[in-house]
Amino acid sequence: CSGFWYFDCDENSEIVNANWSHEFRKMLGYHDTLDFPNKLESWSDLLHPQDKERVMVQLQAAIKDKTNQIKYQVEYRMRMKDNQYQWFRASAEVIRRLDGSASRIAGIFINIDAEKKEIMQAQKSAAFHRAFTKADLCEYYVNLEANTFDTFKVEPSLMTVFEQSHTWDE
């Protein structure tokens, strides 16, 4: 899923108007301008607290860069209408006046939640594997007669502890 958005900027490159497409609102679980108004805060207030500053700094850097060398391409989490967070990727281009000031920034918004969760699960599995092998929390069984090799035998109670431990956001 993807949605379109744009911001109009004044002569000082300050955002004065925001516009969100119907698809953009729908991806977040909203319906129209009544429950998701065309305001910057409608979007920025839903950014995950750990992502908000980074996202806003990147947006301002892209808007203020009169050379267009700084691109707005960022991944972040947003709170959906159901209060769950999902991952999104935003990419935009800045349209400039002759003096280089931003006139409009227009972009696309893509839901990458499934992709991010798949990557995080792979990282989690790799981390568990490293923890098991480096901490000798597993056993290796080689049966030469049957030509078999079993790599893990972790106590169920220990596996539960590892599965319940979280060292990063999911």
Say what each PLM segment does:
Residues 1-43, 127-170:
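PAS-family sensory domain signal
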Residues 113:
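Acyl-donor (CoA/ACP) binding surface of acyl/acetyltransferases
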Residues 31-106, 116, 120-124, 160-170:
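PAS-family sensory domains
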